[in-house]
Amino acid sequence: MLGGLLVLCGCSPKSMPDSDLIGLKFVSSGTMARPEFEGSVRMDSAGVFVLKAMKENYGPMFEKQITAEDMKHFREIIEDEKMYKYKDSYRPRMQVMDGWGWSFWAKFADGSVIESHGSNARPDGNGLGKVHGYMEQLIQDGKQIEFPEE
């Protein structure tokens, strides 16, 4: 019965993709001009996963190759924290104009994509915090690729 209702309204239940995670991005921003934290993982032309992220808030970008096992760990976070159920957008009930926001994107080998963002509101759980924390942990021995102007 529920399945029939979902088909009629054009909705589909959100479920975890069955394929491997091949890309990931998390950005949080405050009231400053640049992101508070930014991290992304992409597969390069040689099939190697490359993490680009900040070691600290508002810091320069660093780069590091990561393993397929690291990508499996990110995938486990997404699954365990049910991040695949995130709404497209999160906003508070009352308008807040302080500029704080975040965005999350994950791509899987079968073409599935999870995308979500928010302004002054976020989903329940600690999925975003765990993704952020694991990116920071991995990038600590990365090579600096962005140099602030002095």
Model regions: which residues?
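Short amphipathic beta-strand/extended segments with alternating polar/hydrophobic composition
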Residues: E38-R42, F62-I66, G111-R122
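A short-motif feature that recognizes glycine-rich, charge-decorated loops
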Residues: V50-Y86
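Post-signal-peptide N-terminal segment of Sec-exported extracytoplasmic proteins
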Residues: T31-N57
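Sec-dependent bacterial lipoprotein signal peptides
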Residues: M1-C9
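Short, low-complexity, polar/charged sequence segments that are solvent-exposed and flexible
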Residues: R42-V48, P60, D70-M71, P123-N126, ...
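N-terminal post-signal-peptidase region of extra-cytosolic proteins
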Residues: E36, G59, D88-R91
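Short, well-ordered, aromatic-rich surface patches in folded extracellular/luminal domains
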Residues: C11-T31, I77, Y84-E150
